[in-house]
Design a protein with these regions (language model features):
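Terminal accessory/targeting
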Residues: 1-20, 29-70, 74-138, 149-304
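His/Cys-centered metal/cofactor-coordination and adjacent catalytic loops
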Residues: 24
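Active-site histidine-anchored catalytic micro-motif
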Residues: 141-143
Length: 304
C-alpha cells in the first residue's frame, strides 16, 4: 500500500473531494449524539435519518444546531416497525415488524411482498422526514437494501419525485476483507451494483467504507486518503456513535458496531492534518451539481 503523500507531491493540483456520511441517525440516542459530535468536529458532512425511529422528533430537534450537515433519508426495511399499515399487515409472519435483510430480500424477490408496498412505505418515510421539516439532499438505505434490483429503480423514482438529487450507489472495495461472510457480502454487492448500473441516471460519488462497515479505523483512513484521485468525488460511509449497553440490548449490534472507535477515528485531530496533507477537501451533497457529463463540484460554495 502507498504511504502518505506530502503536500509538495500534490500541491497545485485539484483536490480530491470527500463526503463523510454517517448512517443511522436516530437509531439510538448514543448513535445520534456520536454523529453530532463528529459533525461538531467538522469531520462528518452528511447523515442519513431513520424515518421510523421512535426518537425521530427529539433527534431531529438536535439537528437545528447543525445547519452545515446535509440530511438524507436512511430508507429502512430491515429494522423496527414500518410506517404504513399495509406493509405491516403484509409482514404478519414477523408480527408486523421488519425482518432481517435476508428475509425481506427473499420476500421481495419471491414477490411475497409486492414492490408497490415498498414504494408506499418509502414514500411515507420520505414524507415523514419532510414534515419535520428536513431539507433532504440524498437517499440511502439501512443495510443497502435499496440496492436490491427490484428496489433500486424505486429509490431513484422517489428521489426524482421529491427533487432529491442523490441516491447512494453502494459498491464493495476489492480486495478488502477476507472472511467468508465479508467475501459473500462483497460478491453479492458486486452483482447488485453491476445490475443497477443500467438504471443510474448520472454519476454518483465513488463509494467507500463497505469493507470497514462498523469498524472504521485510523489505519484505514491513513491507507485510504493518499489513494483518492484529484478531481474525483467520493462518499465514505461511517457509523460513529457512543456505545451504551443500557440502551442497546441486542448483542449482535454491539458485536458488529464499534461505534466508539469510529467516533474516535473521526474526531481525532490528526484527521484534519491528514486531509490537508493528502489534498482532500471535505464537502457535502450541497456542493454537488449533477450534469449530463456527471458530477460537478461547486468549488465557489465551499468554505475554506
Amino acid at each position: 500500500m502507498s504511504g502518505p503523500v506530502s503536500l509538495s507531491t500534490r500541491s497545485g493540483t485539484e483536490p480530491a473531494y470527500l463526503i463523510i456520511n454517517a448512517d443511522d441517525y436516530g437509531y439510538f440516542n448514543g448513535v445520534s449524539h456520536g454523529i453530532l459530535e463528529c459533525v461538531q468536529q467538522g469531520s462528518v458532512t452528511a447523515t442519513g435519518v431513520f424515518a421510523n425511529s421512535p426518537f425521530l422528533d427529539e433527534h431531529v430537534s438536535w439537528l437545528a444546531a447543525h445547519p452545515g450537515v446535509d440530511i438524507g433519508v436512511h430508507l429502512n426495511l430491515t429494522d423496527r416497525l414500518p410506517l404504513t399499515q399495509r406493509l405491516s399487515d403484509a409482514l404478519n409472519n414477523w408480527d408486523g415488524r421488519f425482518p432481517g435483510k435476508f428475509s425481506i430480500a427473499k420476500a421481495v424477490l419471491s414477490r411475497r411482498i409486492p414492490v408497490d408496498l415498498i414504494r408506499d412505505e418509502w414514500r411515507a418515510q420520505i414524507e415523514h422526514c419532510l414534515a419535520r421539516p428536513l431539507k433532504l439532499s440524498f437517499l440511502n438505505s439501512h443495510e443497502h437494501i435499496h440496492m436490491l434490483p427490484p428496489l433500486y429503480p424505486i429509490a431513484l423514482a422517489l428521489a426524482r419525485e421529491y427533487g432529491i438529487e442523490h441516491v447512494r450507489y453502494a459498491t464493495p472495495e476489492w480486495p478488502r476483507a477476507w472472511s467468508t461472510s465479508a467475501m459473500l457480502r462483497d460478491g453479492i454487492m458486486s452483482v447488485l451494483s453491476l445490475i443497477n448500473r443500467f438504471h443510474m441516471p448520472h454519476s454518483a460519488p465513488i463509494f467507500l467504507g463497505m469493507g470497514e462497515s462498523g469498524r472504521l479505523s485510523q489505519q484505514y483512513m491513513s491507507n485510504l486518503l493518499p489513494k483518492l484521485r484529484p478531481g474525483r468525488v467520493y462518499e465514505l460511509m461511517c457509523h460513529p456513535g457512543i456505545a451504551d449497553i443500557e440502551e442497546v440490548k441486542d448483542s449482535r449490534l454491539l458485536a458488529y458496531h464499534d461505534w466508539e472507535r469510529e467516533r474516535q477515528t473521526l474526531s481525532d485531530p490528526t484527521l484534519k492534518m491528514a486531509l490537508a496533507t493528502n489534498n482532500v477537501r471535505l464537502i457535502g451533497y450541497r456542493h454537488l451539481q449533477t450534469t449530463r457529463e456527471g458530477l460537478r463540484v461547486r468549488t465557489e460554495e465551499i468554505s475554506t
